[in-house]
Amino acid sequence: MAVHACGAAAAVVALLSAAIALQWSPLYAVLQRALSLHTAHATKDMENLFQLVRNIVPALTSKKHKGQDGRIGIVGGCQEYTGAPYFAGISALKVGADLTHVFCAREAAPVIKSYSPELIVHPVLDSSNAVEEVEKWLPRLHALVVGPGLGRDDLLLNNVRGILESTKARDIPVVIDADGLWLVAQQPALIHSYHKAILTPNHVEFSRLWEAVLSSPMDSNDLKGSTLKLSQALGNITVVQKGEQDLISNGQQVLVCNQEGSSRRCGGQGDLLSGSLGVMVHWALRAGPEKTNGSSPLLVAAWGACTLTRECNRQAFQKYGRSTTTTDMITEVGTAFSRLFTT
């Protein structure tokens, strides 16, 4: 299943119709019908994707206990970067996770704690036994988000390497972003063929990953094809290339998320995406293929998180314009989620 924008087809029809409408009306009618069918198919694909995301969203019921709808771990946060793990963690809670744990460096912990009393903060990431400390919590977690605010300190990266190995051994889904992607670019074997991994690179991060695993030059005119090829080169893991359109591939198909956002790009909105995706991938895997109509649960989760992030951006921009920040976007999570995915 793929969703394609129909803007290109519309432009072609607009250019040709002026030349042929008067003299070749049958051809004009054919072109108009082609555009109509293209638009109808794109709209149907979009509606199907929205429904698949709605299918994985758990019902709110008094029969559940705390933790069932998501216990998410965020791995990141160092002296320089404390906002990113907070953004990812609080976004996970706003989307609907019950509990969020942040595993960060000791110096980052008091700052992150001060941002929100709702996050459970573990100041262990720069300790000599960081892997063992995080391993103790892994059986309680449904998904990990690795990379927000991580930085590139050798000790932290080495500890995260061990955490990723332990995560794979326990078959826990993992979303990798930011400097977690830098680590993967240095050692692609860390996540190669791990089908519960999702990478969320921006353009620069995507190019770095491409250079690390593919010898051929990247075709900047075929971003969908490039996303597909990078996923295949990494063993068909899910890749989300963020950009003007978000392109999502598991090496077999490509989904396109072109939900309206805004022209404002503020630092931290990728953390909103990764935190949201951590929750949604848990929901999608728990729901299973029967709820995703045979589609990859990870693809459905990724498309849902991308769509939500773009809608938060749109809503915040309508209110704040150029001054929009990620904090403003996070405030919109509840209304955006209801607008998109609540029936």
From Swiss-Prot:
User: Which residues does ATP bind?
Assistant: 242-246, 261-270
Q: Which CDD domains match?
A: YXKO-related (cd01171)
GO annotation, biological process: nicotinamide nucleotide metabolic process
Cite the entry's keywords alphabetically.
Acetylation, ATP-binding, Lyase, Mitochondrion, NAD, NADP, Nucleotide-binding, Phosphoprotein, Transit peptide
Cofactor dependence:
Mg(2+)
PROSITE patterns from the UniProt entry: YJEF_C_3
Localization terms from the record: Mitochondrion
Q: List modified residues, type Phosphoserine.
A: 216
Transit peptide, UniProt annotation: 1-42
- Can you provide one Gene Ontology molecular function annotated for this UniProt record? ATP-dependent NAD(P)H-hydrate dehydratase activity
Chief location category:
mitochondrion
Provide one Gene Ontology cellular component: mitochondrion
Q: So what does this one do?
A: Catalyzes the dehydration of the S-form of NAD(P)HX at the expense of ATP, which is converted to ADP. Together with NAD(P)HX epimerase, which catalyzes the epimerization of the S- and R-forms, the enzyme allows the repair of both epimers of NAD(P)HX, a damaged form of NAD(P)H that is a result of enzymatic or heat-dependent hydration.
Q: Which family does it belong to?
A: Belongs to the NnrD/CARKD family.
Q: What is this protein called?
A: ATP-dependent (S)-NAD(P)H-hydrate dehydratase
Originating species: Mus musculus
